[in-house]
Regions:
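Short linear capping/connector segments at secondary-structure termini
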Residues: 3-5, 103-106, 147-149
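Conserved C-terminal portion of the radical SAM core fold
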Residues: 59, 82-144, 163-165
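Short, hinge-like loop/turn segments at secondary-structure boundaries
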Residues: 51-52, 78-79, 117-119, 149-151
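C-terminal accessory regions of radical SAM enzymes
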Residues: 149-165
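Distinct, well-ordered alpha-helical segments
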Residues: 12-19, 42-52
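Acidic (Asp/Glu)-rich catalytic clusters
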Residues: 19-27, 49-56, 89-93
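Surface-exposed, active-site-proximal loop segments in enzymatic domains
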Residues: 72-75, 142-153
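Core AdoMet radical
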Residues: 1-12, 25-43, 57-84, 99, ...
Length: 165
């Protein structure tokens, strides 16, 4: 598993080079997993993804965070739910399995249940092997913290986050 941010952002050629190095030095490894964003998959063609699959790429963990377009837009993720659907179907067609990262608390106070339902509707149309979750952490240096200070966004309570899950 390649760690460190999202290695799938690399070009197909660089990912192929890395896969060949893995095969050379660790021939007993059957698959190569890594983190990815939906925006890393978009520029890769189906043929490129199929080639990466033959080189061992599988079990890609994608930071989807949510299936709620309003939250995705507010958080400047750079993609919408339709993009998740399109790109994961492309991975399915290429034979690359994937996992999702879901982020509780991303909807803001009073919206967790609605956002969770939208996310479930999206995820139920796809084939993630694993859905992992993490809770939103707000740092004082973040843009989101500034939005809270301006009164534009309110954090979910811990109970809301648990109900959302």
């Amino acid at each position: 598993f390649f760690t460190g941010a999202n290695p799938f952002v690399l070009s197909t050629e660089k990912l192929k080079t890395l896969a060949k190095m893995v095969k050379e030095y660790y021939p007993f490894y059957k698959t190569i997993g890594c983190f990815a964003r939906i925006t890393d998959i978009i520029p890769k063609s189906l043929e490129e993804l199929k080639e990466l699959r033959t080189l061992g790429y599988d079990g890609i963990t994608i930071g989807v965070e949510t299936g709620d377009n309003e939250a995705l837009t507010f958080m400047n993720k750079g993609f919408l739910a339709k993009d998740v659907l399109e790109q994961c179907r492309k991975l399915d067609e290429a034979g690359i399995s994937y996992n999702f990262f879901y982020l509780t608390g991303i909807y803001g106070a009073g919206r967790g249940e609605v956002g969770a339902k939208k996310t479930a509707m999206l995820f139920n149309q796809l084939n993630p092997k694993i859905i992992e979750s993490s809770m939103l952490t707000i740092y004082k240096t973040s843009e989101l913290y500034q939005e809270i200070q301006k009164g534009n966004w309110k954090e979910e309570s811990e109970i809301e986050k648990l109900i959302e899950l």
